[in-house]
Amino acid sequence: MYKQGEPNLWTGRLDSETDPKKFRHFQTVTFEDLSKLEKSSRPSGVGILGYAVDEGVALNKGRIGAKEGPDAIKQAFAGLPDLNQCEALVDYGNVYHDHEELIDTQKEFAMLAAKSIANHRQTFLLGGGHDIAYAQYLATRKVYPTQSIGVINIDAHFDTRAEQQSTSGTSFRQILEEDENTDYLVLGIAQGGNTQSLFDYAKEKKIDYVFADELLSHVSPTIKDMIERFVHEHDVIMFTICMDVIDSAFAPGVSAPAVLGLYPHTVLELAKRIIPSDKVSSVSIAEMNPTYDADNRTAKLVANLVHHFLK
């Protein structure tokens, strides 16, 4: 079920009503009905769409609450300064789960997300469970039907479980099994968060991955080269971040908290090798769970990631 953006979420400190250099995002955001959006001849600006769904987390036996994530992120983002002076920033609202099967909600989200991707220079998809990634893939493939897609996931988990239905832990297996013209790179894998069968599947499918342990002090030149080579080898990049990759000291409000997770600045350093590329069609950020957040710490962290990713 799709609902348009809620203006009441977008509030913040007012420093000026006339000087754009003192504006914050709540002063520049606009609201549109994505279901009625016509294709633009020239993509421009930024589109934001929320995936207010945690059914996939429940099916994956995780702790629910991430369906409240998109609104919490938008509220935190609203008060940040508009340093980029975006040519356009549109909140398209959220998609909610009201179908019998999760896959139908994912398809509905994908149809709408594809419109944003086709019309904007940047599209941010805010979760919600990490089943958003499969929906993001469907949207990407709709916009780019023949191009090679490189999927980059900053995550503690492979999320390549073999299940009978979509969950927050199956997205990347679904993508790889359905589409031979895709490849998968995972940054931040937790050795204690993935079974041997998942490592075996990674070997079988030639999934490139980097352990969290390799990213704790710095991002080495070897890893930077790996990322840049992966971007270079693909026509389109689908970029996604699962917030459970970040240590729970910084990100307590997630579906599955990390005890040996990454520092936020490490995630930013990794993203610097990805975001600047014009090949990046969309960015999704998943598993922000306000139910377990402290002082809105995780919501603010996601908001600041989006803020840093703006071009």
From Swiss-Prot:
User: What cofactor does its activity depend on?
Assistant: Mn(2+)
The answer, when asked if Secreted is one of the entry's keywords, is no
The gene name reads hutG
Q: Where does Mn(2+) 1 bind?
A: 130, 155, 159, 242
One GO molecular-function entry: manganese ion binding
Similarity annotation = Belongs to the arginase family.
- State the free-text cofactor note: Binds 2 manganese ions per subunit.
Q: Which CDD domains match?
A: Formimidoylglutamase
Q: What lineage is on file? A: Bacteria, Bacillati, Bacillota, Bacilli, Bacillales
Q: What is this protein called?
A: Formimidoylglutamase
| Species | Staphylococcus aureus (strain bovine RF122 / ET3-1)
